[in-house]
Curated annotation (Swiss-Prot):
One of its GO terms (molecular function) is structural constituent of ribosome. Pfam families: Ribosomal_S20p. HAMAP family: Ribosomal_bS20. It comes from Aeromonas salmonicida (strain A449). The keyword GTP-binding does not apply. Residues 1-27 are annotated as: Disordered. This is Small ribosomal subunit protein bS20. GO terms for biological process: translation. Belongs to the bacterial ribosomal protein bS20 family. Keywords: Ribonucleoprotein, Ribosomal protein, RNA-binding, rRNA-binding. One of its GO terms (cellular component) is cytosol. Binds directly to 16S ribosomal RNA.
C-alpha cells in the first residue's frame, strides 16, 4: 500500500474507476448479447429493437474510451449486416 498521501488518493481513485469501468463494460456486453440472442431467435422486430438500444451505448462507450472506436464500429457493422440478412 502507498505511503504518500497523493499515492493513496490515486490508488483509491484507480480502484473506483476500475469498478465503474467494469460495470460499464459488463452493461455493454449484456446489450450485445441481447441483440445476438434476438438474431439467433429469428425475430427480426426484436433484433431491430435490441440493436437500436445497443447502438448508442456502443457509441457512448467508444467516446468515453472504454472500448476502441473501431471495435464499436465493427460490432455495429456486423450486427447490422446480420439483421439485414434475416429478411
Amino acid at each position: 500500500m502507498a505511503n504518500i498521501k497523493s499515492a493513496k488518493k490515486r490508488a483509491i481513485q484507480s480502484e473506483k474507476r476500475r469498478q465503474h469501468n467494469a460495470s460499464r463494460r459488463s452493461m455493454t456486453r449484456t446489450y450485445l448479447k441481447k441483440v445476438i440472442a434476438a438474431i439467433a431467435s429469428g425475430d427480426k422486430a426484436a433484433a431491430v429493437a435490441a440493436f437500436a438500444t445497443a447502438q448508442p451505448i456502443m457509441d457512448r462507450m467508444a467516446t468515453k474510451g472504454l472500448i476502441h472506436k473501431n471495435k464499436a464500429a465493427r460490432h455495429k457493422s456486423r450486427l447490422s449486416a446480420q439483421i439485414k440478412a434475416m429478411a
